[in-house]
Amino acid sequence: VDVTLQSLHPRKRVQIKDAPLVFVGYGIDAPERHWNDYKDVDLHGKIAVVLINDADFEADAPGAFDGKAVTYYGRWTYKFEEAARRGAEGVLIVHETAPAAYGWATVKSSGTSPLFDIERSQADAMAQHTPLRGWMQRELAEAIFADAGLDFDAEKRKAMRADFRPVALDNAKLSVDFALKREQVVTRKVVAKMPGGAHGDEAVIFSAHWDAFGIGQPGAKGDRIRRGAIDNATGGGTG
């Protein structure tokens, strides 16, 4: 699998025919950092191809994004959100393990699993989501760039500069046709309190979450459960 395709758009079917692909670098518009990857580009009816993370991750020195520590501009969620604000028909993120911080297996697993969204009005859902969203492997991106007479690494280096401008990927086009199934799911939050003793005016918070992945491929010990504490909470402390 070289590409994963999904949609949170409020429609019954995603039908796109011959949508042109446009490389928009890191897909970031950050006025406060004097950065705009969308200079003079109209993405209506087009697919935005974007890099994961931000321009500082592989830079020789900290720049507009304060070094290697990822900003929200580097998150995949931001890439999808900004492309939707720009009116793109779709967005494809180029996967690379180091800047993404996870391998293709993770992308593939989440990309072939159901998506969840909060309940929205039709208008809000249309504004917040592009009709199509997904990821593609770097090798596929390299081939698409090569067919357009471009070197992927060279274009990536250009995207690390504030003067980067979007690049049409020549004759590269995307056509898709798939149905969407929607279900309303009701979940419940559980909140409880156990009063303390000697330090009753203080609190220790114990929390959990609905894991985004649930069941996956067996790990080294054969466990197929994608435990949230390992998935998301390894940076947390307990006391």
Enumerate the language-model features and the residues they cover.
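Long, well-ordered, tryptophan-enriched scaffold segments
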Residues: 85, 89-98, 102, 108-188
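Noncatalytic luminal/extracellular "stalk/propeptide" segments of secretory-pathway proteins
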Residues: 1-62, 168-189
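Short, solvent-exposed loop/turn and secondary-structure capping segments
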Residues: 33-36, 59-64, 95, 100-107, ...
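Stable alpha-helical elements in mature extracytoplasmic
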Residues: 34, 75-80, 84, 136, ...
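Terminal peptide-recognition signature
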Residues: 22, 43, 83, 137, ...
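Catalytic-core environment of secreted peptidases
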Residues: 2, 42, 46-73, 90, ...
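Second-shell loop/turn segments in exported
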Residues: 7-12, 23, 32-38, 62-80, ...
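Mature extracellular/periplasmic domains of secretome proteins
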Residues: 11-12, 37-43, 78-89, 106-121, ...
